[in-house]
């Protein structure tokens, strides 16, 4: 019996079904040498293996449910990400070989333009002119005190000096009128507060006078003493070393000293042999250590043959004194009559330099 002939549509369906089966077989069976992508994705690398439990073998767990291919392709394994972070944590900034002393320099860009100015603050308080004048007076008083400290110390005796006289009106400006205050201020500003180079400061000086009359016998060498410091304008004393009782001045420092002595001498009773002879004379000396013959001394000689009953004899000069050496005034009466040195005769010294 002849087979029944199938229609053409059925034959086309069979051909299509065979092609689909062949294509499915080719895609599902990979090549023998090629590794499976799903297996490579499923198995972690050797270094990242987790410890296996007692129920797992070396080949893997006994049964693992299959995961969808599309979900596996788009997911990230947290364990793999953590292991990658651990391996990369000792590189870059956290590297062990990086020097701790060298800090990473931050690179900034170019500075931008300045911003707009801020708002203006509130106006300050209104200060009256009287307050400004009072504050200015306080500033001037401070400048005056600073100038007084810069000035040399005043002498023990004598006036306060021209500087103190010029500054005295300024200290009394509190009770004066405004016109007087302005005048004093202008006078103070006219005098420079910081003058130029000054003369060197005198560290040692004195001027003393004989307190009472001193009798000098004939043919005698007498050392004068018992002085006092005059309380008069122009008198001075600076530094230690003067013994008013003994009349000796001890040098406080070694240096060159300008010494001077002026004596007012009165003749006593006339000599028994008649008027003074030409060889009768007086010697006024300023000696070191009371050794007029051995040490250097200042000397003045005066004859008595033509002198009056009251006369003056002076001596001055410069001597170099070591520290601690003293000087004093001597009168050598080389005449046949006694003499009287009147009170008020003076002795002075000034340290010139070292």
Swiss-Prot record:
It is found in: Secreted. Glycans are attached at residues 243, 295, 333. The modification Hydroxyproline is found at residues 111, 113-114, 116-117, 119. One of its GO terms (cellular component) is extracellular region. Residues 69-80 have a biased composition (Basic and acidic residues). Residues 94-107 have a biased composition (Basic residues). The keyword Isomerase does not apply. InterPro entries: Adipolin/Erythroferrone-rel (IPR052136), C1q_dom (IPR001073), Tumour_necrosis_fac-like_dom (IPR008983). One of its GO terms (molecular function) is hormone activity. N-glycosylated; required for secretion of the mature protein. It comes from the Eukaryota. Residues 26-123 are annotated as: Disordered. Residues 111-123 have a biased composition (Pro residues). The record marks 333 as: Required for correct protein folding in the endoplasmic reticulum. GO terms for biological process: establishment of localization in cell; fatty acid transport; intracellular iron ion homeostasis; negative regulation of apoptotic process; negative regulation of autophagy; negative regulation of BMP signaling pathway; negative regulation of gluconeogenesis; negative regulation of osteoblast differentiation. Residues 1-28 form the signal peptide. Gene3D superfamilies: 2.60.120.40. Residues 199-354 form the C1q domain. Residues 26-37, 51-62 have a biased composition (Low complexity). Keywords: Disulfide bond, Glycoprotein, Hormone, Hydroxylation, Secreted, Signal. Homodimer; disulfide-linked. Forms trimer, hexamers and higher molecular weight oligomers. May form heteromeric complexes with C1QTNF2 and C1QTNF12 and, to a lesser extent, with C1QTNF5 and C1QTNF10. Interacts with BMP5 and BMP7; the interaction inhibits BMP-induced transcription of HAMP. Interacts with BMP6; the interaction inhibits BMP-induced transcription of HAMP. Interacts with BMP2. Interacts with heterodimers composed of BMP2 and BMP6 in vitro, the interaction inhibits the heterodimer binding to its receptor BMPR1A /ALK3 and thereby suppresses expression of HAMP. Belongs to the adipolin/erythroferrone family. Iron-regulatory hormone that acts as an erythroid regulator after hemorrhage: produced by erythroblasts following blood loss and mediates suppression of hepcidin (HAMP) expression in the liver, thereby promoting increased iron absorption and mobilization from stores. Promotes lipid uptake into adipocytes and hepatocytes via transcriptional up-regulation of genes involved in fatty acid uptake. Inhibits apoptosis and inflammatory response in cardiomyocytes via promotion of sphingosine-1-phosphate (S1P) and cAMP-dependent activation of AKT signaling. This is Erythroferrone. It comes from Homo sapiens. The gene is ERFE.
């Amino acid at each position: 019996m002849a087979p029944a002939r199938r229609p053409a549509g059925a034959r086309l369906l069979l051909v299509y079904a065979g092609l689909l089966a062949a294509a499915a077989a080719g895609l599902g069976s990979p090549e023998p040498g090629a590794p499976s992508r799903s297996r490579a994705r499923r198995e972690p690398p050797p270094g990242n293996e987790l410890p296996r439990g007692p129920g797992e073998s070396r080949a893997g767990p006994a049964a693992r449910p299959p995961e969808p291919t599309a979900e596996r392709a788009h997911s990230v394994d947290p364990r793999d990400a953590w292991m990658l972070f651990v391996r990369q944590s000792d590189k870059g900034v956290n590297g062990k070989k990086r020097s701790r002393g060298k800090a990473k320099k931050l690179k900034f860009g170019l500075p931008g333009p300045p911003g707009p100015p801020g708002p203006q603050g509130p106006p300050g308080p209104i200060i009256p002119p009287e307050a400004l004048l009072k504050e200015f007076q306080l500033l001037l008083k401070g400048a005056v005190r600073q100038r007084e400290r810069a000035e040399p110390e005043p002498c023990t005796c004598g006036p306060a000096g021209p500087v103190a006289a010029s500054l005295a009106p300024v200290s009394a400006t509190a009770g004066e009128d405004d016109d007087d205050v302005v005048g004093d201020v202008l006078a103070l500003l006219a005098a420079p507060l910081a003058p130029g180079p000054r003369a060197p400061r005198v560290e040692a000086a004195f001027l003393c006078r004989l307190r009472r009359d001193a009798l000098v016998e004939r043919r005698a060498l007498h050392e004068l003493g018992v002085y006092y410091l005059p309380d008069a304008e122009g008198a001075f004393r600076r530094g230690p070393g003067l013994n008013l009782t003994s009349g000796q001045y001890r040098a406080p420092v070694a240096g060159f000293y300008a010494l001077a002595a002026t004596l007012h001498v009165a003749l006593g009773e006339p000599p028994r042999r008649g008027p003074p002879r030409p060889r009768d004379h007086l010697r006024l000396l300023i000696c070191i250590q009371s050794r007029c013959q051995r040490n250097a001394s200042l000397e003045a000689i005066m004859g008595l043959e033509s002198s009056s009953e009251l006369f003056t004899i002076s001596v001055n000069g410069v001597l170099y004194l070591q520290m601690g050496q003293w000087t004093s005034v001597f009168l050598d009466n080389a005449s046949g009559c006694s003499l009287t040195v009147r009170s008020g005769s003076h002795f002075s010294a000034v340290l010139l330099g070292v």
